[in-house]
Amino acid sequence: MIFADIEAKINTKNGNEILLLKQEPKDRDYEKTVLIAGVIHGDEPDGEYLINHYLSNKTDTKNRLLFIPCLNPDGKAQNKRTNANNVDLNRNFPAKNWELTEKGDFFGGEKPASEVETQFLIYIIERYVPDLIITLHEPYSVVNYDGPAKSEAQKISDITGYKVEESIGYPTPGSFGTYCGIEKNIPTITLELPEKSPKDKLWETNKGIFDYLAKEY
């Protein structure tokens, strides 16, 4: 069972729900706000597993923790990278470097923020103004960051053993990291989980991140 409050929700094109879940301190004001989002790409499901595992076994927190376990349920249902409109959500943000590209796995949409999933995430950023954002991807086993997030990236690297990489190694026009980290100056981490890691090992490697976000950050 997942123990968290439903803060907001929307429906996708195919009628699936996207949930924003919240955990806050029980008896005092929160100190910082952290947003953690999984399954931006539908064929990268392990972020949802980690979030749900934490929320089923969570500890107390001094911070306000916001979770989107699965941003792209339509893509996940079809085990594909893109959403129901065949748009790569991580190329659909209204960053200055967004560009109209050929249709395919990396297609960023006909215009920036054309997708309901993207619009929901932008709303959350504007409504809750997080101090730190982490998105969970696969399969490179690295900690990539945008904006003023170097120290947080290094801490997560120390916890997981994944290397810190300031660049993912290829162009990402219209990416979430560029939009939030570089242009909005919000510390933004793209945590690349390993490919097809056994679930128990994946949790053991990454559970310290949630303790850090709840108690230390």
Predicted regions and their residues:
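Short, surface-exposed beta-strand/loop micro-motifs that present aromatic residues
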Residues: 17-26, 176-182
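Generic hydrophobic alpha-helical segments
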Residues: 20, 117, 121, 206-209
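Active-site/substrate-binding loop(s) of hydrolase catalytic cores
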Residues: 30-35, 44-55, 59-170, 186
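Active-site-adjacent mobile loop/cap segments within catalytic or ligand-binding domains
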Residues: 171-217
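Glycine-/small-residue-rich active-site loops that bind phosphorylated ligands and cofactors
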Residues: 42-43, 198
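Short glycine- and acidic-rich boundary segments immediately preceding or forming the N-terminal edge
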Residues: 1-22
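A residue-level signal for conserved active-site and pocket-lining positions in enzyme catalytic cores
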Residues: 15, 89, 191
